[in-house]
Regions:
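N-terminal chloroplast transit peptides
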Residues: 1-15
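Class I SAM-dependent methyltransferase Rossmann-like catalytic core
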Residues: 24-107
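Class I SAM-dependent methyltransferase SAM/SAH-binding core
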Residues: 97-183, 197-201
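C-terminal lobe and adjacent flexible extensions of AdoMet/dcAdoMet transferase-like proteins
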Residues: 100, 261, 278-361
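Hydrophobic beta-strand segment of the Class I
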Residues: 183-189
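A short His-aromatic
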Residues: 191-193
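A short glycine-rich, Lys/Arg-flanked "PGG" loop and its adjoining helix->strand segment in the class I
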Residues: 197-212, 227
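Conserved catalytic/acceptor-binding region of the Class I
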Residues: 214-282, 290-303
């Protein structure tokens, strides 16, 4: 019985060629990119500030034209424009205390991110001088904020204080001031600078040798209550979360940022300021009227009222006070750093000590 198996002829196998592989390589001699990483949408931030000024002016005009109710006084022009200045004024007062603690009062000061001049106004009392000064111009919204109260006595900076609304210092107007001021101060403006080290480096260039920088920036756990509530609500309704609150500086990173910018004898301290609001809606309205809304690049245009309603309920449930209000935490990072100079105290050379530490202890 023959087998049913068939014997196939031998086939000549062709050699299999290896598949090509592609690699992304970087020449080690290639210099790093020079453009700074952009975090914030600066045109949107200027637009937010301009709208905030317009909105407050309209509010002031509407209240000024309305008939005051019985027992109410007609709102003044100054009060109408300073409805939401409470936060900047509080931060500026705390920053002015640190400026007043300097052993030698600086003879020339530049106030960056001056907003409507809150810090400049407070420094008038510290410096006891009332000679009119000058201001720099950068950004329409910042210019409008700086000269918001120009018809009143609110803006009258001393000659040694130069108020500037700019957050970034890469502008021709500030070039002549390099190494010509003894102190640079900034109250609540550095959080909108994407390249913190680059901005602080330019601040150092403004200072004379042995000059000092004193600044306050929001960071850390600022608005953590609202951030948590929005994330929980958006995760529940949308199935994902987006950046609804601008990124903040970590207090533990602040000393290294100052050192990388070239400052010495760096001092960093943090203070938490808690403000109670009737609800999350009033908090968001005040942030909008301050011009401090989210301005991160690539943010979603809308959030949805359903998410906001859910976030407001979560806010009240998780963080609400017994009286029905909700707290909002603002973590203020105070920075003090000195530009290197010949008169600064320096550590002695290693091994130059004349007595052992164990003898002292």
């Amino acid at each position: 019985m023959r087998s049913a198996l068939r014997v196939l002829p031998k086939r000549r196998l062709s050699p299999r060629l290896p598949q090509p592989r592609f690699y992304a390589t970087l020449n080690p001699n290639t210099p790093p990119p020079t453009a700074a990483y952009q975090v914030f949408d600066e045109p949107s931030k200027d637009l937010q500030r301009s709208r905030a000024i317009i909105r407050l002016r309209e509010l002031q005009a509407a209240k000024a034209n309305a008939e005051p109710a019985q027992g109410e006084s007609q709102i003044s022009a100054e009060d109408g424009l300073r409805v939401v200045d409470y936060l900047r004024e509080e931060v500026s007062e705390r920053l002015a205390e640190r400026i007043g603690d300097l052993r030698v009062p600086p003879s020339s000061i530049m106030d960056l991110s001056a907003h409507a001049g809150q810090l400049t106004q407070i420094l008038q009392d510290v410096l006891a001088d009332e000679v009119p000064g000058q201001g720099q111009n950068e950004g329409q919204g910042r210019q409008e904020a700086l000269y918001r109260d120009q018809d009143s006595c609110f803006i009258s900076p001393p000659e040694r204080i130069q108020a500037s609304p700019s957050d970034l210092l890469a502008h021709p107007e500030i070039e002549p001031l390099k190494e010509q001021v003894e102190a640079v101060v900034s109250s609540g403006g550095l959080q909108w600078v994407g390249d913190i080290v680059g901005g602080l480096t330019q601040v150092r260039h403004l200072l004379k040798p042995d000059g000092v920088f004193v600044g306050a920036v929001f960071g850390g756990d600022t608005l953590f209550e609202m951030r948590t509530s929005l994330q929980l609500a958006e995760q529940e309704i949308r199935g994902g979360i987006a950046n609804r609150v601008s990124p903040m500086i970590n207090p533990t990173d602040a000393p290294s940022l100052m050192n990388r910018a070239g400052f010495t004898s760096v001092t960093v301290d943090v203070e938490d300021l808690t403000i109670n609001y009737p609800s999350m809606w009033e908090l968001m309205a005040d942030l909008r009227d301050m011009g401090e809304s989210n301005a991160i690049l690539g943010r979603r245009a809308t959030i949805g009222r359903d998410v906001l309603v859910a976030a407001s309920s979560i806010y009240q449930e998780l963080f609400g006070n017994e009286d029905g209000t909700v707290p909002a935490t603002f973590s203020i990072i105070f920075l003090i750093g000195w530009k290197p100079g010949p008169n600064q105290p320096k550590p002695s050379k290693r091994g130059s000590g004349q007595s052992a530490l164990q003898d002292v202890l």
